[in-house]
């Protein structure tokens, strides 16, 4: 492909999105560039502090539990207080708690602050997703969510590489750098990102949306359930795969080489793949991506070399690239405008719970039945999710066309009655 065609493709991928989106995107990228603690936390606790692997696992679980709690709380805050205040509170709290964690020495204090870090860091996710849905036109949302997902993975890839060098110098420096970068995100949001929550008066006849409304929305909760199944499969890349490779005699470096394929492919392919899938049938994309995820991990049962492990990672990474923006777009499509925060919070909860369940599932299956059964189970779960999406999406009403080409600011979309959004059941 010529440089001219490449440049044109890049321009088409990033054009047409509002300025507010790009400031929010920048905040996300900066946040992930500074995400050092998640990478070296286990090493910090076991090597630097001398705690056991069991204690490190407990701290990781408490961090995840904090995320589960704040998934719902962050969604409620995004609807009640607004997207911008929620982001500012969450990012400031994350910066303070991460810095504090670096100075903790007592095991109870470390565990408690890790829980707070999990709560604070996860509270911003529903607000970010709701804000993107507010400020981006419906026809551009899949592309916007893809670009945001790309920024997350690009930042994490860079921070993961930098974390090793920083840890050799000082673990405390890693905590403080992450705190500083997170605080910088809050500054960007404060200075450049306006509030996007639709004014209540714009839709006076709309019924109040509470958590009960979300939980009674059968169609939406079916999507959340399917999202949980897919997340359960994807989580095995970080919990089941390293254990299985270790038991098969492969070194940590071998696992690092295999899993690095995931980040490299996402950074390289997310934008071009998005151009291919942007206007395609989401039902087909979700069914195919679920099957690819399940069978990609299922193929791991036949891996006997690092090269084959890398090949299986390629398969399920392609599924991840397709599934992530399409799934998020479906969630927004089913969310009423004034309840987006709560709806996004419940959706985020599915991934948070999967992050807690996946390690338990992987450990139990590998210990009792063997790794082959885990990969077979992934194939079954992926197939079930694919069938579920096929049935669910067949019953969805078509998404209505957008009546204006102007950027869908909160006021514009609310005034138009959110015509491009399918009302929640």
What are these regions (language model features)?
Residues 113-152:
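Cytoplasmic helix-loop-helix junction between adjacent transmembrane helices
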Residues 85-99, 284-299:
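Structural signature of the two symmetry-related core transmembrane helices
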Residues 2-18, 194-225, 421:
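Juxtamembrane intracellular "pre-TM" segments in multi-pass secondary transporters
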Residues 17-64, 220-258:
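Helix-loop boundary and gating motifs at the non-cytosolic
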Residues 68-105:
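Conserved MFS/SLC helix-loop-helix module at the cytosolic interface between two early adjacent transmembrane helices
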Residues 148-190:
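Helix-loop-helix hairpin linking two adjacent transmembrane segments in secondary transporters
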Residues 180-199, 388-393:
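C-terminal membrane-cytosol helix-exit motif in multi-pass small-molecule transporters
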Residues 70-82, 269-282, 366:
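Helix-to-loop junctions at the C-terminal end of transmembrane segments
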């Amino acid at each position: 492909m010529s440089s001219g065609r490449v440049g044109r493709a890049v321009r088409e991928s990033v054009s047409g999105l509002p300025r507010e989106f790009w400031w929010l995107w920048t905040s996300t990228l900066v946040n992930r560039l500074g995400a050092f603690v998640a990478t070296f936390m286990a090493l910090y606790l076991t090597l630097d502090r001398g705690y056991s692997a069991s204690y490190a696992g407990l701290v990781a679980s408490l961090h995840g539990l904090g995320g589960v709690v704040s998934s719902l709380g962050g969604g409620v805050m995004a609807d009640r207080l607004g997207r911008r205040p929620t982001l500012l509170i969450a990012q400031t709290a994350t910066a303070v708690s991460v810095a504090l964690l670096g100075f903790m020495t007592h095991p109870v204090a470390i565990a408690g602050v890790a829980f707070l870090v999990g709560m604070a860091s996860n509270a911003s996710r529903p607000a970010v997703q709701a804000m993107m849905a507010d400020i981006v036109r419906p026809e551009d949302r899949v592309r916007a969510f893809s670009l945001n997902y790309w920024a997350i993975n690009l930042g994490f890839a860079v921070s993961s590489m930098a974390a090793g060098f920083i840890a050799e110098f000082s673990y405390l420096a890693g905590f403080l750098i992450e705190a500083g970068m997170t605080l910088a995100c809050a500054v960007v949001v404060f200075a450049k990102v306006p509030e996007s929550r639709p004014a209540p008066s714009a839709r006076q006849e709309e019924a109040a949306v509470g958590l009960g409304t979300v939980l009674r929305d059968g169609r939406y909760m079916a999507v959340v359930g399917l999202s949980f199944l897919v997340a359960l499969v994807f989580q095995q890349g970080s919990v089941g795969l390293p254990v299985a490779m270790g038991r098969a005699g492969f070194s940590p470096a071998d696992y690092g080489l295999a899993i690095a394929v995931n980040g490299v492919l996402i950074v390289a392919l997310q934008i071009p793949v998005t151009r291919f899938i942007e206007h395609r049938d989401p039902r087909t994309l979700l069914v195919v991506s679920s099957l690819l995820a399940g069978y990609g991990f299922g193929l791991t049962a036949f891996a006997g070399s690092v090269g084959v492990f890398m090949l299986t990672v390629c398969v399920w990474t392609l599924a991840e690239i397709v599934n992530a923006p399409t799934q998020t777009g479906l969630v927004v499509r089913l969310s009423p405008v004034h309840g987006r925060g709560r709806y996004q919070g419940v959706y985020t909860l599915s991934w948070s719970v999967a992050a807690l369940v996946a390690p338990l599932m992987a450990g139990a299956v590998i210990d009792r039945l063997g790794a082959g059964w885990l990969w077979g189970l992934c194939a079954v779960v992926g197939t079930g999710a694919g069938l579920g999406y096929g049935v669910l999406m067949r019953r969805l009403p078509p998404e209505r066309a957008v009546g204006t080409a102007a950027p869908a600011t909160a006021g514009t979309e609310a005034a138009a009655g959110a015509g491009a959004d399918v009302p929640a059941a």
